[in-house]
Amino acid sequence: MRFALTVTGPAYGTQQASSAWQFAQAVLQEGHELACVFFYREGVLNANQLTAPASDEFDLVRGWQSLHDEHGVALHICVAAALRRGVTDEREAQQLALPGHNLQPGFTLSGLGALAEAALTCDRMVQF
């Protein structure tokens, strides 16, 4: 079965993102395909490379990155939601004359078209 996830909660402060990450791990362990994760609203904060959790906490931002690196899962960040919340890549930062960028490697700024495509091409879409 082919899955896609939508994450609307931040990396820290709610259970949404950590529950989504655990669900993603279970999907892959059961032999299913995880096509993509689309981060929307506060969920875009999962892509902020400046996040620095305490040493005894799981680093969820790098956890998502490892999901991409090890399993090829596409990590889409809603570009409009990201820019509103101060998450940007180098290209957008230059275009908007921002002083820096902070998008974690492995994540991609995307439009809602990526979410629509996932809804059309996956068997299940699960929102957290």
Swiss-Prot record:
Protein name: Sulfurtransferase TusD
Record note on quaternary structure: Heterohexamer, formed by a dimer of trimers. The hexameric TusBCD complex contains 2 copies each of TusB, TusC and TusD. The TusBCD complex interacts with TusE.
EC class of the enzyme, as a word: transferase
Record-linked InterPro entries: DsrEFH-like, Sulphur_relay_DsrE/F-like, Sulphur_relay_TusD/DsrE
Similarity comment: family membership: Belongs to the DsrE/TusD family.
Enzyme Commission numbers on file: 2.8.1.-
Subcellular location: Cytoplasm
Active site residues according to the UniProt entry: C78 (cysteine persulfide intermediate)
Superkingdom of the source species: Bacteria
The entry's keywords: Cytoplasm, Transferase, tRNA processing
Record bears the keyword rRNA-binding: no
Assigned GO CC terms: sulfurtransferase complex
MF terms in GO: sulfur carrier activity; sulfurtransferase activity
GO terms (BP aspect): tRNA wobble position uridine thiolation
Role: Part of a sulfur-relay system required for 2-thiolation of 5-methylaminomethyl-2-thiouridine (mnm(5)s(2)U) at tRNA wobble positions. Accepts sulfur from TusA and transfers it in turn to TusE.
PANTHER family documented for this protein: PROTEIN YCHN, SULFURTRANSFERASE TUSD
Keyword tRNA processing attached: yes
Lineage: Bacteria, Pseudomonadati, Pseudomonadota, Gammaproteobacteria, Enterobacterales
Record gene name: tusD
